[in-house]
């Protein structure tokens, strides 16, 4: 494997996940289902999720949307708000299917749903149903399923389809996930997901309870080309962004920048991990989270320029973010 650049030699290698911009058959999207978790944000979070689903579906020009609800009541609400979607009722803890759902490898008849251990982001939020929702979604989609014996969340990695991924040391080397060395993590990424080159970034965003998921920090937009945020003048993550840029340059990857939302505060006055990098790349549209700050529109414009042939759509995600993530975090694509 290549670390920061060096390919691992390897024996048996898994089929790789396709890059997110490859054609999708469908997408699983988690639908907020537990009033005890979402409290006063539930209704607005439901509406934000439904708007995201509609943008991805694009009137049938996009991809099939499978809204995953944890109970019959939430399923009924999902059908009302998103009548274009298939609603799948399967018990789960919360909506973060990027991390709890399966990663679908390969394409066509050769697809395999690959699952991993999940421990609530290092024991922070261990909720019933999150540990096996991936296997149940794979079964409902009639996809063969395999599960690895180590903890890995989908939001912790981002690949370019050619065998290279970016990730963060803060998450993948965190002892609250696994007791694995860097070399052991790299070997497992090769064996289970076919990734030959791991580019290690340092820390993720401030106050990110996932311990620095890379899908809030750096995203591939083409083979060998990575988008990262450019800090604002008072950006709480300025040092993180500078460090990421330096490591990506050292790895000889092509870097493009998006604006950063800057300093976005929650109701308690604390910095929240708002990021435009948590966009979702659908068949017809790239959906970019918006936070009601000055750089919202500029971020959408940059994303649209990066994906010719797709429209970029900015949608508010304030209430989803109160749960800890945004559009990429609640979705998991199924390649065609």
Each model region followed by its residue ranges:
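The feature marks the mature, well-folded catalytic cores of soluble enzymes
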Residues: 5-336
């Amino acid at each position: 494997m290549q670390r920061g650049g060096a390919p691992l030699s390897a024996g048996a290698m898994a089929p790789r996940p396709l890059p997110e911009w490859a054609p999708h058959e469908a997408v699983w999207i988690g639908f907020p289902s537990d009033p005890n978790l979402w409290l006063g944000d539930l209704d607005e979070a439901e509406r934000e999720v439904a708007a995201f689903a509609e943008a991805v579906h694009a009137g049938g020009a996009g991809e099939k949307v499978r809204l995953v609800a944890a109970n019959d009541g939430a399923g009924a609400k999902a059908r009302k708000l998103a009548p274009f979607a298939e609603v799948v009722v399967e018990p789960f803890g919360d909506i973060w299917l990027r991390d709890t759902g399966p990663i679908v490898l390969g394409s066509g008849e050769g697809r395999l749903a690959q699952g991993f251990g999940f421990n609530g982001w290092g024991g922070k939020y261990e909720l019933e149903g999150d540990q096996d929702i991936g296997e149940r979604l794979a079964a409902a989609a009639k996809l063969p399923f395999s599960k690895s014996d180590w903890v890995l969340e989908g939001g912790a990695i981002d690949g370019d389809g050619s065998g290279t991924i970016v990730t963060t040391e803060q998450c993948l080397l965190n002892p609250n996930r696994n007791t694995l060395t860097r070399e052991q993590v790299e070997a497992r990424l090769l064996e289970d997901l076919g990734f030959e080159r791991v580019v290690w970034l340092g820390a993720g965003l401030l106050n990110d309870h996932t311990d620095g998921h890379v899908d809030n920090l750096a995203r591939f937009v083409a083979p060998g080309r990575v988008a990262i945020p450019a800090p604002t003048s008072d950006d709480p993550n300025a040092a993180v962004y500078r460090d990421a840029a330096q490591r990506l340059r050292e790895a000889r990857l092509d870097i493009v920048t998006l604006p950063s939302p800057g300093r976005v505060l929650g109701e308690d006055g604390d910095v929240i991990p708002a990021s435009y990098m948590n966009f979702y790349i659908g068949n017809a549209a790239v959906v970019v989270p918006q936070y009601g700050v000055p750089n919202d529109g500029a971020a959408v414009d940059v994303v649209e320029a990066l994906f010719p042939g797709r429209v970029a759509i900015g949608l508010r995600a304030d209430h989803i973010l109160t749960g800890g993530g945004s559009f990429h975090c609640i979705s998991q694509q199924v390649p065609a």
